[in-house]
């Protein structure tokens, strides 16, 4: 800044700018520029979508031997964000747009292609009519025929609209609403009838059960008592057995008599005539033989089991038989 404002540059009197040598650069040299994708595209290599407005560091070059009205055409090189494949496109000053050249396909291009096709057909038709007068008559005949078909279709649409105009949509909706309400009312009545029938059936069943219970509670006195069936004992459920404790198994029950005690019949001792006459019985002499019953008395304990009593009874019978 100080040099521009304060100091002056010196130009010698023999200064000639044409004599200064210029740097020779190739015409197809490339520059690195920062740009955004001008349209939506899809990579042909990996199928990755690249949307419009995505920024790239692109290489820019001038297309050789392609000029439109003196305007140069530029080519740009970018790389796919996924597979790093090279994609190229160039400017189109004729249509103020860009054209895809290599590496990708342009999306949403159907409308543009259709417009280009229409322009091409129109141009070919104009070229044919320019050199062939008969072609002009044929094209006019085709146009008039197409126009008549369009008018017929338009008339059909008008008739259809008129027929639909006479239809009262409000009345149709009202009728549909009434039919729906009637159907809902009928369904509600059927539900009520079914509920009433179920309640009536339940009430009758309850009355029958009450009458049966009254009949069972008050039997008729004239009816004779039924005798028990002899085989009814087989149908009875078995009674639960009392759990026998360990001490009862070893010692025996003290409070109740065992069931086999009924089988043991205790004999009554015969009255001795000597004792009945009042004379005392003589004491046995020492060394005299005594019967087995007196030698081996079997005292009965109140807590003895039934099996021990039965064994003692059998021993007493054997001793009596031997005597």
Swiss-Prot record:
It holds the Pfam family Saf4_Yju2. The keyword Disulfide bond does not apply. The keyword Phosphoprotein applies. Signal peptide: none annotated. Keywords: Metal-binding, mRNA processing, mRNA splicing, Nucleus, Phosphoprotein, Spliceosome, Zinc. GO terms for cellular component: nucleoplasm; U2-type catalytic step 1 spliceosome. This is Splicing factor YJU2.
